[in-house]
């Protein structure tokens, strides 16, 4: 089963989706499962993980509604207020929804670089494992220190770093990002998504060679059993089509980890998110 571990859906709302700036005007429209279907068919994608783009429970319910009407969406990474004193009650509520596999907070936007290890946030993280939920870490390199501290404090909790922690590819900078990624990868409960690369590069003039030093770092650090392909569709469209994004990662894997291609393009995501092929009518 080939899985895209990271894509988004939304019904565009200018007031809500303020992160979509004028420089991203092509994203100022609806992106729904019917819009992704052709891309999945053309690129051999059996299943996807739909990830939240808005920080509200309404977003989580919206994605679950889409997933429950689709065999293609194998899982949802939603949002819940992990800082709320009612977090256990909300996790209990969401645990009844089979397609919900985990949660994410847009930590990259938090002004406090240590938000991930704040007392209230850690209290919420501490409840996830009880319900079998994963956690997606969305950060910039400057927040890696806090992320390392977080994952070390919760060694039994499954974490995945989204978009390789957004290295500064356009600037050609690798440190201190590389050191941070090697450090966080020492925790066996942490995975990493090979996603979001093209939008960290020069949108109009990137080339595959720009990405290789960064891919080399995470392959060496995490190993092929803790990496997973993600398209970051439709955000990737700012810099590349779906097929180009998949080909970028596929070409790298075929040269550097060919025997683990099945893992990186499905097996690892299936294991991490607990995707059950028989439930979704998908081939294993």
Where are each of the predicted segments found?
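Mid-to-C-terminal alpha-helical segments outside catalytic/metal-binding sites
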Residues: 1-3, 26-47, 217, 221-228, ...
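Conserved, mostly hydrophobic/aromatic
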Residues: 6, 48, 63, 76, ...
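Catalytic metal-binding/acid-base residues of hydrolase active sites
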Residues: 8, 54, 165, 197-198, ...
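Divalent metal-dependent hydrolysis catalytic cores, especially in the metallo-beta-lactamase
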Residues: 21-29, 34-55, 73-81, 101-105, ...
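Active-site gating/metal-coordination segments in enzymes
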Residues: 56-142, 149-151, 193-197, 204-205
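Short, electropositive alpha-helical surface patch
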Residues: 58-74, 155-161, 211-220, 242-252
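Catalytic pocket-lining loop regions of alpha/beta-barrel enzymes
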Residues: 115-228, 279-284
């Amino acid at each position: 089963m080939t899985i895209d571990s990271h894509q988004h859906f939304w019904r565009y709302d200018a007031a809500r989706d303020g992160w979509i700036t004028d420089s991203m005007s092509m994203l100022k429209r609806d992106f729904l499962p019917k819009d992704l279907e052709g891309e999945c068919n053309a690129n051999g994608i059996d299943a996807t993980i739909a990830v939240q783009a808005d920080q509200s429970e309404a977003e989580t319910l919206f994605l679950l509604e889409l997933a429950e009407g689709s065999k293609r969406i194998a899982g949802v990474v939603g949002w819940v207020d992990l800082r709320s004193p009612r977090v256990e009650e909300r996790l209990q509520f969401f645990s009844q929804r089979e397609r919900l596999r985990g949660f994410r907070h847009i930590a990259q936007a938090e002004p406090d670089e240590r938000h991930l290890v704040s007392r209230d946030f850690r209290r919420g993280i501490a409840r996830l494992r009880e319900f079998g939920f994963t956690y997606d870490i969305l950060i910039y390199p400057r927040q890696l220190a806090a992320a390392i501290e977080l994952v070390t404090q919760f060694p039994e909790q499954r974490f995945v770093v989204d978009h390789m922690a957004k290295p500064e590819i356009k600037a050609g900078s690798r440190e201190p990002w590389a050191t941070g990624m090697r450090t966080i990868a020492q925790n066996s409960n942490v995975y990493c998504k090979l996603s979001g690369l093209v939008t960290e590069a020069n949108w109009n003039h990137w080339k595959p060679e720009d990405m290789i030093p960064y891919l080399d770092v995470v392959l060496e650090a995490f190993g092929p059993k803790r990496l997973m392909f993600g398209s970051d569709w439709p955000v990737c469209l700012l810099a590349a089509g779906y097929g180009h994004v998949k080909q970028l990662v596929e070409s790298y894997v075929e040269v550097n980890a060919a025997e683990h291609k099945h893992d990186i393009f499905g097996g690892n995501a299936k294991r991490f998110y607990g995707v059950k092929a028989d439930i979704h009518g998908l081939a294993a």
